[in-house]
């Protein structure tokens, strides 16, 4: 357990996921944590967990050694107005599209770590990229311990975060799209909604396990299911004829492009 005073700006879904992860793993004790938000109801729920709450961000800034910015980017500039120069401020941002340099421009002299999480963090099954290069070893370890409680973490330079946004940050939506298509196809062929969903979801869970435990490449896994003259190969042929793989890659590239545009205009 760390003895740092930790502030969390925001009390939305992701902020709550972070807070719950911290409390579940004991990274920081509740009495050392303060959360700010404008919503009294959200703060009341958080207060019941033994955590301090405030509505004034200035109070949070002055009473925290590390501050997690867990708000939407469009809210950020409003929060920045509450900032007054504080020595040795350490910012941990999960805001998409706002770079470390942009944050340093607002928080003069601050050290900044940037995190790119995704929504499965809400269930402790997220994927997080972390750039905490500004922090000393103890600060880095704190950041990694916090976000390990939300899923898997990788250390990566911020210059790759637009790609991370496109692959894992937005990735759950792509997977949901494919899952929905499979469920709908099953229903079109006479399966009930419940059965089609159950079979589809377990297929995804099992396929992920197969990929994680593979001793060969993914292309070989595909070929292992595609018996010549069989059923699977007909579906895979159709995917190839319709350029499914290129369609997916093109969508991911467009996502990366938009992420870069948002960063440049922040």
Task: Explain the meaning of each model-derived region.
Residues 112, 161-166, 218-223:
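Short pre-catalytic strand/loop immediately N-terminal to key active-site residues, enriched for Gly-Thr
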Residues 1-55, 61, 125, 187-188:
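NAD(P)+-binding Rossmann beta1-loop-alpha1 motif at the extreme N-terminus of oxidoreductases
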Residues 29-32, 63, 89, 194:
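Short acidic capping loops at alpha-helix termini that bridge into adjacent secondary structure
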Residues 201, 205-266:
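NAD(P)-dependent Rossmann-like dehydrogenase/reductase catalytic/cofactor-binding core
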Residues 49, 57-128:
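Rossmann-like NAD(P)(H) cofactor-binding subdomain of soluble oxidoreductases
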Residues 33, 60, 192-199, 221, ...:
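Small-residue helix-packing motif on alpha-helices
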Residues 102, 106-111, 127-163, 176-213, ...:
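Internal alpha-helical scaffold of NAD(P)-dependent oxidoreductase catalytic cores
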């Amino acid at each position: 357990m760390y003895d740092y005073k930790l502030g969390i700006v925001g009390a939305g879904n992701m902020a709550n996921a972070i807070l719950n992860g911290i409390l579940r793993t004991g990274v920081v004790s509740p009495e050392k944590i303060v959360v700010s938000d404008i919503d009294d109801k959200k703060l009341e729920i958080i207060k019941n967990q033994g955590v301090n709450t405030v509505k004034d961000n200035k109070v949070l800034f002055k009473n925290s050694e590390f501050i997690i910015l867990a708000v939407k980017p469009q809210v950020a500039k409003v929060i920045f107005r509450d900032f007054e120069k504080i020595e040795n401020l350490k910012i941990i941002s999960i805001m998409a599209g706002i770079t470390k340099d942009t944050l340093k421009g607002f928080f003069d002299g601050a050290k900044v770590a940037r995190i790119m999480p995704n929504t499965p963090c809400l269930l402790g099954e997220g994927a997080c990229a972390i750039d905490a290069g500004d922090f000393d070893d103890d600060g880095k370890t704190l950041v990694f311990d916090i976000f390990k409680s939300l899923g898997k973490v990788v250390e990566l330079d911020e210059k790759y975060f637009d790609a991370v946004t496109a692959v894992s940050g937005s990735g759950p939506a792509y997977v949901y799209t494919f899952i929905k298509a499979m469920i709908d196809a099953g229903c079109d062929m006479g399966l009930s909604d419940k059965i089609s969903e159950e079979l589809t979801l377990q297929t995804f869970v099992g396929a992920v396990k197969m990929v994680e435990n593979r001793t060969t490449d993914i292309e070989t896994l595909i070929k292992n299911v595609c018996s010549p003259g069989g059923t699977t190969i007909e579906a895979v042929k159709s995917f190839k004829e319709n350029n499914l793989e290129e369609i997916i890659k093109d969508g991911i590239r467009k996502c990366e492009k938009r992420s870069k545009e948002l960063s440049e205009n922040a």
